[in-house]
């Protein structure tokens, strides 16, 4: 069983955005990254798409939703500022029911999920933090993540 953790694609500068941050959209570069992520995951057997409530996360998953015919579900535990254990536990509950989830979140939440999984015994192959549009492929066995593979962003950003 797999869980795919995706950091949202490029959304431009937070400091240059004068509205509520959760409404900040993807930049043109981010739109291209989102399409590349979709191309990479379209045939990954994903059953559900989960997103932080933030627009940039939902937009990151739109091309994958179009490619798979799935709807993007907003999941509050993936919102920026949340801790790793609740998000990880929600993802593991889905995996326990046999669902493959692709979840898009933020640069604080995803490393917290990875850190929680490694504290619980998962092996991490790659960096603990990834750039925008980077992702982790997590292998689940016996109710826990056992292996995490870091996949760099599609445009090679580091």
Regions found by a protein language model. Give the residues of each.
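Short hydrophobic/charged patches on amphipathic alpha-helices used for structural packing
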Residues: 38, 89-92
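Extended, charge-rich low-complexity interaction segments
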Residues: 108-115, 158
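Generic beta-sheet signal
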Residues: 3, 97-108
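Short, solvent-exposed coil/turn elements at secondary-structure transition points
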Residues: 9, 78-80, 141, 151-154
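Active-site-proximal alpha-helix that buttresses catalytic centers in soluble enzyme cores
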Residues: 2-82, 122-123, 130-133
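Domain-level recognition of soluble alpha/beta enzyme cores
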Residues: 118-149, 153
């Amino acid at each position: 069983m797999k869980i795919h953790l995706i950091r949202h694609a490029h959304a431009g500068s937070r400091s240059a955005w004068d509205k509520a941050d959760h409404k900040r959209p993807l930049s043109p570069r981010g739109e291209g990254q989102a399409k590349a992520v979709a191309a990479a995951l379209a045939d990954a057997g994903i059953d559900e798409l989960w997103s932080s409530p933030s627009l940039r996360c939902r937009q990151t998953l739109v091309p994958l939703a179009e490619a798979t015919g799935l709807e993007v579900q907003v999941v509050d535990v993936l919102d920026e500022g949340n801790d790793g254990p609740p998000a990880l536990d929600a993802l593991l509950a889905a995996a326990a029911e046999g669902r493959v989830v692709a979840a898009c979140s933020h640069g604080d939440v995803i490393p917290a999920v990875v850190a929680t999984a490694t504290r619980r015994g998962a092996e991490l192959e790659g960096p603990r933090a990834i750039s925008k549009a980077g992702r982790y492929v997590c292998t689940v066995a016996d109710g826990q993540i056992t292996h995490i593979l870091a996949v760099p962003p599609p445009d090679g950003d580091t």
